[in-house]
């Protein structure tokens, strides 16, 4: 559990003493008896509304954090702050271009800060307190964020906003394409990556010249507050970002009343579609990820592939938008004993080292009920797991089950729409569906992937060139790994991560993703002459 991790990684509070003044809380001392207090930020000022609400510790239920709970009559400052931002943004290629350099400098300083072991350790432990995962998984968030900041240090921010020129039809004419900001924007992100997702997205919004209203799931939002405080310490103007804790309904009201020009939402498909209607389509979405993996006919590296499958399905207790939700095994893999190896690996996961732990958005009862519903499908069987974790103190508002897999025959998955809907329901926890197929059923596998609604990540585990060609040519997932080392999880800073097949689809992490989500194209055609003498001014 997290307490053991803290004990292992902290030596007499040394890391705490080395932190800068921006880190105004002690991760090790947050408890029901000593709750931490989060603050809202608007127009550069930290403040508290009249009410706060408490958040239960995922491990023991203690109310260990107080979160601001602003009401509808308390958010006028947020609305005015966003309304004060022009459509042309805080900066753009023609207005205050020195701010591109400013953010290159901020990134450089922030990367240096996050490179400090005590700072990375602080964020890793803070993440563990709110979004339970193992220390290596939590530390990876800090490391990825640090690498992202390194990537955009120096001139890289203005390089990301690079314009282009095109010659015209006559002397004095030239067209120039610019990446133009939206101005006032919204940014809403979920609980499962409380640092990496909001940090990378808010920086992208700022790079392009927008002013974002930042809202992270209130159950984990203290993490991003600490990141914003660190950015202030590293030179970011204090009024460049507004941060609001609290409930999503009030945030939605702010976005509507302020008439923000665009909003990035990462989270559930249901909320995404509701928000798209409320904001009249002015959204980018990175929503539900019912992600699949296909193991091709060529069996090799069995131990490694089994390990990756286990990591994809159960790391962070399955609470990744890229987690492996369905595994298609070629019969050759079944014959090689893959399922038994998955069962053995799953059995090793435990709460002592946080390789399995609390589930934030699904209760134990809900996950086990879904497991039972899957088992009602003809031919379905429990491959492993399927029980509540033993001897835990996870509060009932959260969930705690063993790593679980239910085998469902491929023909049954395709039998009718109701069964298909049940099988492809995303459980944001340690539960996956597995099935198998023969050479003659490859098209059936493709039919399943075609009928799915979510197209975020996928993995095709094979080095068979013809098999890869067929699978890649007939699928659409925006982030697809292919080859014997393919995985579904992994959203590093060095490649695009996002869905495909939806014009609202958002990406994260790369210059291309930032330009797509946080800027639009503007063309300016300069036509200064000279006007040729004797030009016939004929009306047409």
Task: Write out the residue ranges for each language-model feature.
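N-terminal Rossmann-like NAD(P)+-binding subdomain of aldehyde/semialdehyde dehydrogenases
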Residues: 2-4, 8-174, 217
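Conserved C-terminal structural/oligomerization subdomain of aldehyde/semialdehyde dehydrogenase
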Residues: 4, 19, 60-66, 96-100, ...
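Generic secondary-structure signature for well-ordered alpha-helical cores
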Residues: 84-91, 112, 116, 132, ...
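Rossmann-like NAD(P) dinucleotide-binding subdomain of oxidoreductase/dehydrogenase enzymes
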Residues: 128, 159-305, 501
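Flexible loop/turn segments at secondary-structure boundaries
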Residues: 193-195, 220-221, 250-252, 271-272, ...
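ALDH superfamily catalytic-core signature
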Residues: 230-235, 258, 270-418, 440, ...
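Beta-strand->loop->alpha-helix junctions that form or flank phosphate-binding loops
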Residues: 266, 285-287, 383-391, 459-463, ...
């Amino acid at each position: 559990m997290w307490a053991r991790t803290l004990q292992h990684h902290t030596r007499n509070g040394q890391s705490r003493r080395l932190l800068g003044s921006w880190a105004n809380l002690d991760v090790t001392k947050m408890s029901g008896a000593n709750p931490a207090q989060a603050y809202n930020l608007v127009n550069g000022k930290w403040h508290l509304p009249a009410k706060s609400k408490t958040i239960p510790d995922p491990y023991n239920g203690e109310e260990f954090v107080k979160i601001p709970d602003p009401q509808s009559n308390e958010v006028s400052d947020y609305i005015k702050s966003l309304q004060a931002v022009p459509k042309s943004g805080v900066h753009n290629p023609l207005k205050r271009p020195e701010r591109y350099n400013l953010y290159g400098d901020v990134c450089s300083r922030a990367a240096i800060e996050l490179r400090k072991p005590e700072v990375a350790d602080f964020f890793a432990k803070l993440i563990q307190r709110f979004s339970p995962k193992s220390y290596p998984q939590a530390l990876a968030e800090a490391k990825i964020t640090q690498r992202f900041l390194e990537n955009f240090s120096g001139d890289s921010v203005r390089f990301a906003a690079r314009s282009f020129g095109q010659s015209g039809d006559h002397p004095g004419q030239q067209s120039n394409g610019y990446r133009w900001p939206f101005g006032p924007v919204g940014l809403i992100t979920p609980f499962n990556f409380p640092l990496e997702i909001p940090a990378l997205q808010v920086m992208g919004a700022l790079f392009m010249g927008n002013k974002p209203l930042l809202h992270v799931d209130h159950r984990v939002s203290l993490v991003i507050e600490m990141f914003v405080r660190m950015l202030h310490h590293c030179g970011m103007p204090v009024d460049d970002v507004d941060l609001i804790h609290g409930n999503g309904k009030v945030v939605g009201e702010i976005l509507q009343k302020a008439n923000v020009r665009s909003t990035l939402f990462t989270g559930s498909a249901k909320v995404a579609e509701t928000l798209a209607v409320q904001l009249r389509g002015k959204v980018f979405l990175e929503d539900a990820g019912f992600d699949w993996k296909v193991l091709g006919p060529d069996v090799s590296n069995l131990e490694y592939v089994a390990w990756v499958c286990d990591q994809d399905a159960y790391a962070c207790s399955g609470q990744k938008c890229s987690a492996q939700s369905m595994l298609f095994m070629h019969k050759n893999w079944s014959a090689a004993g893959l399922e038994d190896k998955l069962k053995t690996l799953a059995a090793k996961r435990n709460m002592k080292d946080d390789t399995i732990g609390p589930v934030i958005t699904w209760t134990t009862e809900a996950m086990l009920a879904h497991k039972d519903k899957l088992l009602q499908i003809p031919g379905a069987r429990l491959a492993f797991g399927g029980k509540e974790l033993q001897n835990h103190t996870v509060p009932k508002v959260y969930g705690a089950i063993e790593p679980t897999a239910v085998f469902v025959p491929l023909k049954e998955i395709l039998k009718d729409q109701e069964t298909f809907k049940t099988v492809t329901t995303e459980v944001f926890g340690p539960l996956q569906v597995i099935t198998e197929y023969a050479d003659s059923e490859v098209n059936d596998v493709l039919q399943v992937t075609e009928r799915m609604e979510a197209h975020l990540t996928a993995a095709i585990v094979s080095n068979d060139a013809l098999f890869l060609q067929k699978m890649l040519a007939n699928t659409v997932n925006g982030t697809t790994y292919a080859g014997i080392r393919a995985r579904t999880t992994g959203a590093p800073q060095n490649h695009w991560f996002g869905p495909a097949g939806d014009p609202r689809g958002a990406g994260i992490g790369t210059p291309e993703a930032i330009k797509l989500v946080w800027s639009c194209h503007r063309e300016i055609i300069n036509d200064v002459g000279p006007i040729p003498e004797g030009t016939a001014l004929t009306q047409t």
